């Protein structure tokens, strides 16, 4: 990823700032491993035994087959999970990508709530509504555990 950001007097590249190693704490590391493992497990569910439940969450306005959407999102989840677990050099970019992914799949959670779809143990409107509020937590978890928040702060001080 390479784009130029102009900071009043001199250009800096986003690539240089985001790809540099950002030191994280033990807690961030542990939570990144947990989230990466969760993503790999979710991907396995998408690709195998939970495919039908995930298909039920795909909004009807998406112009692709529900099965294709579930398979593609499972592949993306697997790649992001592996990236969270092993791609240290690009950890910040993987965290940003995972945060964006969580935002992109949010309409599926909204569809589950608005259409009262029972899946993954969410069998009441209250449970489905609470799940909606968990999505921002996942976005922040991805960004914080990978050091992306710190990288953004460092970038803003230039």
Label every PLM stretch briefly.
Residues 2-158:
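Membrane-interface extramembranous regions
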